């Protein structure tokens, strides 16, 4: 049927392909790439984020890793301040962890983020899992939006 609401996805982009270990209560940038909804996301305002990683010792069940954005080029080429563990910037969502040491593929709680910043760097905050996220973690983003079916 034409005209009904459908979900469409863009091309997945890797923001971090091999992240360094993130200690409990520490913050790390996914610094392989920033994400720009115009250039990378087909101007789709929403995005799905997937974090893949493991812990050397099982984290506390149900605790979270937070995802923050640092908006870029907010005034010409001026960027906002980078987030800190005691001062977050733009909260995007959380990844709830399982109490296992095997690799976890974790989808952002709520499945996707609505209205991500136009251009941003992204950070993972290990805010209370009780363990370090092991080196080698990845963060990927897939743009998405709703539109009318043809």
Predicted regions and their residues:
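C-terminal interaction-tip segments
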Residues: 1-15, 116, 126-150
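Solvent-exposed, flexible loop/coil segments flanking beta-strands in beta-rich domains
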Residues: 2-45
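Short amphipathic, basic-aromatic surface patches that mediate peripheral association
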Residues: 37, 49-59
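Noncatalytic modules at the cell exterior or secretory-pathway interfaces
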Residues: 44-51, 113-134
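Short coil-to-beta strand junction motifs in C2/discoidin
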Residues: 60-67
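Acidic Ser/Thr/Pro-rich low-complexity disordered segments
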Residues: 73-91
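Short proline/glycine- and polar residue-rich coil/turn motifs
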Residues: 94-102
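Exposed aromatic-hydrophobic patches
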Residues: 102-112
């Amino acid at each position: 049927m034409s005209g009904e609401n459908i979900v469409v996805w863009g091309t997945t982009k890797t923001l971090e392909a091999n992240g360094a270990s993130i200690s409990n209560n520490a913050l790390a940038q996914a610094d392989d790439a920033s994400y720009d909804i115009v250039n990378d996301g087909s101007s789709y305002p929403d995005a799905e984020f997937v974090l893949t990683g493991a812990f050397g010792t099982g984290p506390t069940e149900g605790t979270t890793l937070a995802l923050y954005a640092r908006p870029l080029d907010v005034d010409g080429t001026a960027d906002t301040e980078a987030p800190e563990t005691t001062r977050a910037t733009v909260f995007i969502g959380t990844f709830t962890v399982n109490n296992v040491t095997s690799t976890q593929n974790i989808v952002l709680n709520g499945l996707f983020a609505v209205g991500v910043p136009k251009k941003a760097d992204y950070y993972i905050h290990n805010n209370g899992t009780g363990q370090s996220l092991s080196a080698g973690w990845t963060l990927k983003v897939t743009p998405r939006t709703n539109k009318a079916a043809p």
